[in-house]
């Protein structure tokens, strides 16, 4: 087993920013068609609610084994502006981002900047195009039962309580408007009466079901008025119904959570949840999931939602682009972060240059030895200010530096509205003025500026606290990951790929030292390294001193990782240094058209599409890889080991100046 240094072989990458649109229909026309088709659903579902804040460009923390006031008018104005926001970036902003992305990446990070410097295999590296199309990267979640999630059933579970499809068309737009105003207590009416034109029991039943399903919290009754039949809607529980409308209309015999498989293309999990929330008119926090999935990929994962019927969810399949919902079931419990067993990846590397022998050696090494379990580049952000630098400033209690790192102008091109916001901040130090430059205020910069407007420049800690907790913790987790990557590289450089006395292994969740007399009982796959914290132990060899020196250089005390603000105290965790993927398989295929898909997705299979057939020879060659990884493990680091090169976008941009043309 040999360990090799980084080589300078080029990794080409496709146009990451440009979305594929193979339908032949202009994107805008398709969007209008979909929105028109779905306007009925958007206007009739439940409550109008604020959405939870979502932060852009902050990497999410992987799971590890753990050890242990400004003016009122200004704040009101800011909140009013937020209410006017829609799905995020305007089309103008999206175009601006696309045009400037390559320039922005030139000022980003390389792998060496974050401690990623070693390989475990000795094969010769080769190049390939990663994610030329987002459909070349498919992620299937592995559930807590060990099964790989697939979308293969769009049917709705049989339930006598479920209303028919007619509930979506039986009410007029005016009736829906009146019912929504009643539901939300927007006027003084205590009831709404709807005349039954076709007085049949079936028609009355559908109207009853439509009101109860589409306007949770309302009850109905039938009344005779002057010889005519009316369905009368009213609040059975007063304003309590508004607080939890689903509580008053959900059958007791049915599990409270509808579980479903979400298939999505080119959208991350939180963005997808926000879209579903908007169409259903509910808060995002009624959804639960076991893990977040990245944007530029096709991903399949299980989601649970509180007291939303499978029928309402299935109706969204008619409305949403790049989403598909299916495999519905009712369960008693939600899903919890970290419950998944891992993810299964199907990855296509196009236009590979490696010979069949090189590919064989690379994939055999991945299968038999594995790869260094580095935290991937997405852990550290994509701009000129890495997230670990912000995390380090938080741990140092340097709050002015935290504010400056997030808000100051930075080198390299950036989204146009952010450039204007940063320039305004640098010029005026006025958070309200800078915030006005942001059309999207739910990014980290917008949230911090809101906090500064509310709490003032002398209370940066409280202002920073406006950012959602998980996103704040991303910064310090990024710093921990930065330290871990550097220390693992040094551990492998000093001791190679065999366990040595003083290394750490886990027994359950507890770390213990490898002693001289039992070193032969372990392999490198058992060895773990700590993320720095107050509740971990460090290797009992010279890597312990390397940890101490690195933290001391950053003005941090390795013996005192508790912070005066409890949220930012680091307990630490342990992480395996080498990961061996499971279910590894691969094939090299020949193809001529770089735009054709090289395998079927779940949706392709549902639609009955024939799997692609490959000729024995073609203009290009591609490597199709399948493998499963445990949670918090980065597939890009496995791909890096196969190709033997720097996977950072900065390096790819510098070595491939035409990759975005």
Swiss-Prot record:
One matching Pfam family is: TruD
Locate the N-acetylmethionine modifications and list their residues: 1
Q: Where is the composition biased (Polar residues)?
A: 36-52
What are the GO MF terms of this UniProt record?
Answer: enzyme binding; pseudouridine synthase activity; RNA binding; tRNA pseudouridine(13) synthase activity
Domain TRUD: from-to ranges: 370-580
The UniProt keyword set, sorted, is:
Acetylation, Disease variant, Dwarfism, Intellectual disability, Isomerase, mRNA processing, mRNA splicing, Nucleus, Phosphoprotein, tRNA processing
Q: Which reaction does it catalyse?
A: a uridine in tRNA = a pseudouridine in tRNA; uridine(13) in tRNA = pseudouridine(13) in tRNA; a uridine in mRNA = a pseudouridine in mRNA
Q: Which parts pass through the membrane?
A: none
One Gene Ontology CC term in the entry: nucleus
> What EC identifiers does the entry list?
5.4.99.-
Q: Report the top EC class in one word.
A: isomerase
Where does this one sit in the cell? Nucleus
- Alphabetical list of CDD domains matching this protein: PseudoU_synth_ScPUS7
Give me any GO biological process, just one: pseudouridine synthesis
Residues bearing Phosphoserine are 10, 127
Protein's job? Pseudouridylate synthase that catalyzes pseudouridylation of RNAs. Acts as a regulator of protein synthesis in embryonic stem cells by mediating pseudouridylation of RNA fragments derived from tRNAs (tRFs): pseudouridylated tRFs inhibit translation by targeting the translation initiation complex. Also catalyzes pseudouridylation of mRNAs: mediates pseudouridylation of mRNAs with the consensus sequence 5'-UGUAG-3'. Acts as a regulator of pre-mRNA splicing by mediating pseudouridylation of pre-mRNAs at locations associated with alternatively spliced regions.
Please state what the protein is called.
Pseudouridylate synthase 7 homolog
This chain's source organism reads Homo sapiens
């Amino acid at each position: 087993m040999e360990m090799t240094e980084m080589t300078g072989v080029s990794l080409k990458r496709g146009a990451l920013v440009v979305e594929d649109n193979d339908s032949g229909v202009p994107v805008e026309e398709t969007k209008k068609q979909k929105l028109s088709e779905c306007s009925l659903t958007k206007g009739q579902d439940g409550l109008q609610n604020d959405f939870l804040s979502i932060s852009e460009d902050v990497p999410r923390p992987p799971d590890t084994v753990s050890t242990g006031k400004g003016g009122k008018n200004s704040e009101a104005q800011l909140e009013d502006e937020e209410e006017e926001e829609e799905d995020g970036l305007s089309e103008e902003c999206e175009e601006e981002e696309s045009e400037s992305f390559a320039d922005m990446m030139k000022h980003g990070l390389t792998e060496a900047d974050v401690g990623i410097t070693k390989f475990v295999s000795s094969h010769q590296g080769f190049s390939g195009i990663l994610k030329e199309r987002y459909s070349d990267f498919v992620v299937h979640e592995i559930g807590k039962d060990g099964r790989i999630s697939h979308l293969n059933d769009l049917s709705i579970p049989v339930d006598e309580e479920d209303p028919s499809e007619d509930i979506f068309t039986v009410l007029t737009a005016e009736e829906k408007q009146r019912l929504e105003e009643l539901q939300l207590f927007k006027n003084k009416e205590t009831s709404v009466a709807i005349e039954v034109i076709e007085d049949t029991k079936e028609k009355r039943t559908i109207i009853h079901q439509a009101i109860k399903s589409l306007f949770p919290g309302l009850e109905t009754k039938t009344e005779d008025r002057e010889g005519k039949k009316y369905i009368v809607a009213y609040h059975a529980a007063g304003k309590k119904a508004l607080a939890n409308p689903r509580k008053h209309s959900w059958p007791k015999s049915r599990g409270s959570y509808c579980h479903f498989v979400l298939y999505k293309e080119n959208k991350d999990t939180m963005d997808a949840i926000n879209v579903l929330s908007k169409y259903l008119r509910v808060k995002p926090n009624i959804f639960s999931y076991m893990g977040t999935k990245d944007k530029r990929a096709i991903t399949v994962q299980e989601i649970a939602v509180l007291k939303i019927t499978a029928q309402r969810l299935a109706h969204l399949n008619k409305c949403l682009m790049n989403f598909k919902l299916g495999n519905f079931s009712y369960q008693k419990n939600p899903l919890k972060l970290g419950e998944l067993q891992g993810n299964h990846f199907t990855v296509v590397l196009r236009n590979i240059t490696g010979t069949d022998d090189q590919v064989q050696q690379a994939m055999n090494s991945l299968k038999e030895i594995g790869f260094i379990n580095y935290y991937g580049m997405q852990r550290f952000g994509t701009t000129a200010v890495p997230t670990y630098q912000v995390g380090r400033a938080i741990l140092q209690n340097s709050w002015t530096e935290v504010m400056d790192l997030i808000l100051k102008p930075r080198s390299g091109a950036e989204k146009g509205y952010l450039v204007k916001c940063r320039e305004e901040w640098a010029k005026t130090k006025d958070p309200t003025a800078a915030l006005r430059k942001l059309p999207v205020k739910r990014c980290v910069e917008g949230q911090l500026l809101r906090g500064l407007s509310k709490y003032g420049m002398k209370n940066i800690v409280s202002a920073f606290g406006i950012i959602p907790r998980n996103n704040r913790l991303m910064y310090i987790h990024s710093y921990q990951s930065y330290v871990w990557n550097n220390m693992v590289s040094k551990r492998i450089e000093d001791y190679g790929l065999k366990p040595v006395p003083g290394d750490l292994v886990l027994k359950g969740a507890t770390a213990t030292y490898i002693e001289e007399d039992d070193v032969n009982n372990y392999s490198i796959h058992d060895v773990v390294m700590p993320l720095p914290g107050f509740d971990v132990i460090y290797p009992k060899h010279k890597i312990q001193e390397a940890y101490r020196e690195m933290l001391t250089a950053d003005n941090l005390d390795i013996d005192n990782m508790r912070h005066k603000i409890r949220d930012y105290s680091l307990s630490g965790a342990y992480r395996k240094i080498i990961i061996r993927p499971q279910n590894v398989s691969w094939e090299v295929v020949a193809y001529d058209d770089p735009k054709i898909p090289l395998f079927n997705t779940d949706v392709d299979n549902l639609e009955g599409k024939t799997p692609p057939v490959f000729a024995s020879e073609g203009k290009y060659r591609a490597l199709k890889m399948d493998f499963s990884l445990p949670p918090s493990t980065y597939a890009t680091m496995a791909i890096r080991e196969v190709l033997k090169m720097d996977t950072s976008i900065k390096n790819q941009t510098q070595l491939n100046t035409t990759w975005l043309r």
